[in-house]
């Protein structure tokens, strides 16, 4: 059999709800699908170091009124963040928790699909099941105005 790697890219809000989802090939750079996924967003977008890109940040600011906030790499100049942004950046574990629930509870990480249709059916049914969960992981005591999304 053949194995075709894929990546699931997701943007979630502070309530753990899926805002945008995209599937790409496994060898796709993480920054590539962000432009498609974030066009209708506004506010602040929190991501890990894999999303650091001056060009992406400028594009998001210009086309979607979104600010990308990431942790810095080792040899980057420190940047001053607002205290709320710093606190929210420390809650990136919310994304890992959501992906953990998608993989373990919704069983989207299944490697023996017999067809592309079976793969897509399994993925979509897992995403739909997650959307119907009554209790999703959230950031507690969220008092910030506006929408917060996390990559």
Pin down the residues of each PLM region.
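Hydrophobic (often cysteine-bearing) scaffold residues that line and stabilize catalytic clefts
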Residues: 30, 91, 120, 124
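Anion-binding and metal-coordination hotspots
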Residues: 45-46, 60-67, 115, 120, ...
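Helix-centered, glycine/charged polyanion-binding patches within enzymatic domains
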Residues: 44, 49-117
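Polybasic low-complexity intrinsically disordered regions
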Residues: 1-64, 69-74, 127
């Amino acid at each position: 059999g053949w194995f075709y790697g894929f990546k699931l890219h997701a943007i979630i809000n502070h309530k753990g709800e899926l805002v945008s989802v995209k599937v790409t090939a496994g060898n796709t750079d993480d920054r590539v699908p962000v432009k498609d996924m974030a066009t209708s967003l506004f506010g602040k977008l929190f991501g890990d170091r894999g999303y650091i890109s001056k060009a992406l940040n400028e594009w998001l600011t210009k086309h979607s009124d979104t600010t990308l906030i990431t942790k810095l790499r080792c040899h980057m100049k420190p940047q001053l963040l607002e205290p709320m942004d710093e606190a929210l950046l420390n809650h990136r574990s919310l994304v890992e928790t959501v992906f953990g629930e998608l993989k373990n509870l919704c069983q989207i990480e299944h490697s023996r699909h017999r067809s592309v249709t079976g793969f897509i059916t399994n993925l979509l049914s897992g995403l739909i099941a997650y959307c119907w969960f009554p209790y999703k992981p959230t950031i507690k005591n969220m008092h910030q105005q506006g929408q917060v999304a996390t990559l």
